[in-house]
Amino acid sequence: MPAELRRLAVLLLLLSARAALAQPWRNENYERPVDLEGSGDDDPFGDDELDDIYSGSGSGYFEQESGLETAVSLTTDTSVPLPTTVAVLPVTLVQPMATPFELFPTEDTSPEQTTSVLYIPKITEAPVIPSWKTTTASTTASDSPSTTSTTTTTAATTTTTTTTISTTVATSKPTTTQRFLPPFVTKAATTRATTLETPTTSIPETSVLTEVTTSRLVPSSTAKPRSLPKPSTSRTAEPTEKSTALPSSPTTLPPTEAPQVEPGELTTVLDSDLEVPTSSGPSGDFEIQEEEETTRPELGNEVVAVVTPPAAPGLGKNAEPGLIDNTIESGSSAAQLPQKNILERKEVLIAVIVGGVVGALFAAFLVMLLIYRMKKKDEGSYTLEEPKQANVTYQKPDKQEEFYA
């Protein structure tokens, strides 16, 4: 190393000496051509740039400047160690940065797994709700005897599954309303159904009701198995067609859990309650008649008879084959009735009559007042003396006493 440094120092000294000798010699002998009369002074170039442009006598002194450039190239040898040291620094900086990033993903993965485990039970609860919806939809076709024969087999299979959840069976009657309601109503009903399920989970109640459901399902399977297929049959006009559609509907329904689990029948009671206000508008006569029909075949079930009244509006919809979507039609009919019969209402008629009378009296009063004023003007009640008196009273404040005051 000391030998190399010495060589570099010697080279630098030689180059500096050459440059020092060349520059004064150039300054003494080399002169730039000057044009006093021309525009030579107007050149925008600086002194350094003019040296390159004006070559003078063409003696080629510029070669010595190239020698200076060689000196610069020699300096690159000394700067070689500098990038090596600089290269080491970013490496050290990058290493500590890489370690924390590696640690964070490991920590993040563990909580994600735990959260996924928590979400799994929630997902399992969600499919149970649609199964209740499907089961609750089709209990209403109790009138046709053919449907009862087809559903007896399904009831026998479901008895095993319903032992734990038999508390909900009592409420299966109101499920008939869901067929006609659109999917929006069914969703709302499912939310309420979940809330009711929690109170029914008490152990003593389930043990008593399970026995009742098993006995009920085999003989009186008419209402419960019907609940599964009826969403498809609700749109069909005749009850005979509903019986034919019963076997096909359970297969089409996406939640397969509906035939297996009958706890959805609790939810059906809530669904029927939701549907009562929506469907009550269009037809009240048919609904009342069919309420009795639904309660009579299901009287064999002890608890079912209590729930039947809320389910009646759904049955009324079934009685009318022409109305496929009663919920939408009921809303439209309710909105149209007030528009058509606004004048027929007693309140509106009374308001119109009273308003007309008051308006007529007010108009008559205005007319009488105008007539009265016109008569006074014609009689000359307004004399010319009155304005004179007014002028006199107006001149009083012009007195000096009042002015000073």
From Swiss-Prot:
One of its GO terms (molecular function) is growth factor binding. Residues 373-405 are cytoplasmic. Residues 38-52 have a biased composition (Acidic residues). The chain crosses the membrane at residues 348-372. Residues 23-347 are extracellular. One of its GO terms (cellular component) is plasma membrane. Residues 202-237 have a biased composition (Polar residues). Glycans are attached at residues 39, 55, 57, 59, 66, 280, 283, 330. It is a single-pass type I membrane protein. O-glycosylated within the Thr/Ser-rich region which could interact with lectin domains on other molecules. The record marks 346-347 as: Cleavage of ectodomain. Proximal chondrogenic central core of embryonic limb buds where cartilage differentiation is being initiated. One of its GO terms (biological process) is positive regulation of substrate adhesion-dependent cell spreading. Residues 191-201 have a biased composition (Low complexity). Keywords: Developmental protein, Differentiation, Glycoprotein, Heparan sulfate, Membrane, Proteoglycan, Signal, Transmembrane, Transmembrane helix. Disulfide bonds: none annotated. Residues 1-22 form the signal peptide. It is found in: Membrane. PROSITE patterns: SYNDECAN (PS00964). Residues 31-59, 134-159, 191-301 are annotated as: Disordered. Cell surface proteoglycan that may bear both heparan sulfate and chondroitin sulfate. The multiple functional domains provide potential sites for mediating the adhesive cell-matrix interactions and cytoskeletal reorganization involved in limb chondrogenesis. Interaction with other matrix ligands as well as phosphorylation and shedding of the ectodomain might be involved in cell shape changes that occur during chondrogenesis. Furthermore, shedding of the ectodomain might break the adhesive interactions that promoted condensation, thus facilitating the deposition of cartilage matrix molecules. Belongs to the syndecan proteoglycan family. This is Syndecan-3. It comes from Gallus gallus (Chicken).
